């Protein structure tokens, strides 16, 4: 049986790993996606053929030096409830199956919907009960979807893309020596993401780590 999942080539490895962890196989439908440059809000919705719908908490998505920065939004509850209703209605009216990311302005105006899993979903690998990637595989096989609730309310995730001429071992050792809480996960030999949870200086710490990995700074 063939199960094709639309995914950005940058994070395709994470789908393959999720499938392997479940003992399943999937066929990838690779794409190259573009995420809006301005800071915005994003909700991932996953709908299985068995009519089960799961949505993830609203994330704030921004860019820093063309890198994607994701963290829990601080938007008010009234707006969050409104966005949830909009997403639920759009999913039902579109007969969507699989994964879709709904993007809105900070004021709640609809921007777009993408059916391709992209880099702005990697946060879920660290801070959701079940990642977007695992639930995408579950949806493809019409299996019950996993829980989407957050494991923590304070975290920040940023992707990296290191020049191929730079080594990775020494930077990894340096970062872990200075901040044991870093999660540095590779998608390929020189791409991946840095994640950190905590209650202070998250952007400064994570952006420092990404700059160090990419050779922008050397200390």
Annotate each predicted stretch with a short phrase.
Residues 9, 77-84, 126-130, 134, ...:
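Electropositive phosphate-/nucleotide-binding environments in soluble metabolic enzymes
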Residues 84-101, 116-162:
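Active-site "cap" helix and flanking loop/linker of ATP-utilizing ligase/carboxylase catalytic domains
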Residues 108-118:
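A short beta-strand motif that forms the metal-chelation/ATP-contact edge
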Residues 5-7, 24-34, 158-160, 196:
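Short, hydrophobic beta-strand segments that form beta-sheet elements in well-ordered domains
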Residues 138-219:
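Peripheral (often C-terminal) accessory segments that flank ATP-dependent C-N-forming ligase machineries
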Residues 22-24, 28-99, 104-108:
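Internal nucleotide-binding/catalytic subdomain
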Residues 2-26:
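Short, charged N-terminal beta->alpha structural module
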């Amino acid at each position: 049986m063939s199960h094709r999942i639309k995914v950005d080539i940058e994070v395709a490895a994470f789908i393959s790993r999720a499938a392997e962890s479940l003992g399943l196989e999937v066929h990838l439908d690779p794409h190259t996606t573009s995420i809006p440059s301005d800071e915005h809000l994003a909700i991932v919705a996953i709908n299985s053929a068995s009519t089960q719908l799961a949505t993830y908490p609203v994330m704030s998505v921004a860019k820093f030096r063309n890198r994607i920065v994701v963290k829990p939004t601080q938007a008010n509850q009234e707006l969050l409830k409104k966005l949830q209703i909009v997403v639920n209605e759009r999913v039902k009216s579109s007969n969507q199956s699989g994964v879709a990311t709904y993007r809105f302005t900070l004021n709640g105006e609809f921007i777009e919907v993408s059916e391709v899993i992209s880099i702005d979903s990697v946060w879920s690998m660290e801070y959701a009960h079940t990642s977007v990637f695992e639930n995408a595989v579950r949806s493809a096989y019409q299996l019950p979807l996993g829980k989407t609730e957050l494991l923590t309310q304070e975290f920040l995730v940023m992707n990296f893309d290191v020049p191929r001429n730079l080594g990775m071992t020494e930077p990894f050792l340096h970062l872990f020596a200075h901040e044991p809480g870093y999660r540095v996960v590779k998608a390929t030999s020189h791409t991946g993401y840095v994640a950190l949870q905590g209650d202070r200086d998250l952007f400064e710490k994570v952006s420092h780590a990404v700059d160090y990995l990419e050779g922008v700074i050397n200390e």
